[in-house]
């Protein structure tokens, strides 16, 4: 019996440590919604928004793409006003963990960023990516205008026609209404916390798989 209990708690600890969700000692209750870039330096760049699982992973993936200047982790797609991470974790806010991508359109276009989105996650799993499950981890390609919407719709049609994933794509196509920047400790989480169990076991391997799959879109190594 003691051995069974030991295995149970060991498994429980592993699941908790392998989850994107953490309980920080200090939580910001009301993150500020992001409408305009926070930095004058970013105002010359365009923005794109994607949700494809834990934003720690997704932020690092887009940071590696040539032409991307900055990536912000946050929340979008729901109805709860000024959500915080604790609320997001319940899966009842309607929001998904989302990244805001600032990019230079002279170096990379929206369709390429969309290709990065589909090449870096499984768009056929509903409300789940890897070990993370819940509506907050669902797949969403956001659009800012009709042109971006058309690009997303056409791209999904191409993927479906080519049967690239072998199963129906469940990615939502949504108009970006508001993006809420996540708490500060989430920003650059993978870069700043390379020894975190989730980062080592899930996030970094996911980033490396993407890099191996799409070397042509990566920034030059310094």
Specify the residue positions occupied by each region the protein language model found.
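Flexible coil/turn and secondary-structure edge motifs
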Residues: 7, 16-222
């Amino acid at each position: 019996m003691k051995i069974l209990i030991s295995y149970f708690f060991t498994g429980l600890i592993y699941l908790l440590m392998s989850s994107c969700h953490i309980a920080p000692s200090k939580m910001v209750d009301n993150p500020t919604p992001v409408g305009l870039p926070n930095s004058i330096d970013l105002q010359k760049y365009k923005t794109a928004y994607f949700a494809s699982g834990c934003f720690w992973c997704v932020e690092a993936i887009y940071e590696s793409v040539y032409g991307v200047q900055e990536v912000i982790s946050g929340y979008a797609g729901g109805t709860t006003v000024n959500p915080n991470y604790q609320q997001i974790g319940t899966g009842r806010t309607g929001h998904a963990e989302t990244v805001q991508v600032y990019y230079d359109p002279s170096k990379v276009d929206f369709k390429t960023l969309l290709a990065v989105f589909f090449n870096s996650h499984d768009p056929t799993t509903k409300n789940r990516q890897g070990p993370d499950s819940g509506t907050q981890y669902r797949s969403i390609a956001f659009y800012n205008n009709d042109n971006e919407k058309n690009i997303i719709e056409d791209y999904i049609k191409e993927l479906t026609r080519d049967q690239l994933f072998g199963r129906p794509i469940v990615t939502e196509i949504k108009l970006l209404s508001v993006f809420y920047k996540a708490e500060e400790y989430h920003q650059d989480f993978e870069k700043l916390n390379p020894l975190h169990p989730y980062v080592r076991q899930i996030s970094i391997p996911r980033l490396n798989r993407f890099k191996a799959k799409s070397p042509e879109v990566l920034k030059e190594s310094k």
